Amino acid sequence: MEKEGVTMVINFEELHPNERAELERNIFFSTLEQLKGWARSNSLWPMTFGLACCAIEMMGVGSSHYDLDRFGSFFRTSPRQSDVMIVSGTVTKKMAPIVRRLYDQMPEPKWVIAMGSCATAGGPYVNSYAVVKGVDQIVPVDVYIPGCPPNPAALIYGINKLKEKIRYEAKTGKQVTNK
């Protein structure tokens, strides 16, 4: 009989192998950091922030054909409710301070995905005096998605890579950088 308020301590070495196998199937061992990483990776809220043609592909991810909601990601319109910024399109030098301000308004922890060749490296406008040669010059980027424009499946793949990165960092305690 187990009494209320009594904590049981089980020594695994004293258990029969069948009992040990049963306990291992039904007990989940983890650290708080790993649980937080798992929860964060499965509930990403990207901010809708499209600057050019890649934004059309980003909108496609929310359609019924791809349905990003089934992965636990819900688009938010406010940076204060978002934890992922998806920069999709050409970032001009005039737009750069706004991108930085939106990034600064996001709560911690926060991540950035650069979607398309314009956000990644300037795209076809790379030699223009008015274009930033990659959004990573303004904010730290966690995942790069190549293409002009990348299709919605590529964006879903990039979001899944970000989820893997979040879980890995929570599990190991090591920061993964792109440089």
Curated annotation (Swiss-Prot):
GO terms under cellular component: plasma membrane; respiratory chain complex I
The answer to whether the entry has keyword Iron-sulfur is yes
What is any Pfam family matched here?
Oxidored_q6
Please give one Gene Ontology molecular function term for this protein. iron ion binding
Q: Which UniProt keywords apply?
A: 4Fe-4S, Cell membrane, Iron, Iron-sulfur, Membrane, Metal-binding, NAD, Quinone, Translocase, Transport
Instruction: Give me the residues that bind [4Fe-4S] cluster, please.
Output: 53-54, 118, 148
Q: What is its EC number?
A: 7.1.1.-
* Required co-factors: [4Fe-4S] cluster
Q: How is the cofactor bound?
A: Binds 1 [4Fe-4S] cluster.
Listed InterPro entries: NADH_UbQ_OxRdtase-like_20kDa, NADH_UQ_OxRdtase_20Kd_su
Q: Which reaction(s) does its UniProt entry say it catalyses?
A: a quinone + NADH + 5 H(+)(in) = a quinol + NAD(+) + 4 H(+)(out)
Top EC class for this record: translocase
- State its location(s): Cell membrane
Name the job this protein performs: NDH-1 shuttles electrons from NADH, via FMN and iron-sulfur (Fe-S) centers, to quinones in the respiratory chain. The immediate electron acceptor for the enzyme in this species is believed to be a menaquinone. Couples the redox reaction to proton translocation (for every two electrons transferred, four hydrogen ions are translocated across the cytoplasmic membrane), and thus conserves the redox energy in a proton gradient.
Family of the protein in this entry = Belongs to the complex I 20 kDa subunit family.
Q: What is this protein called?
A: NADH-quinone oxidoreductase subunit B
Q: Which organism is it from?
A: Bacillus thuringiensis (strain Al Hakam)
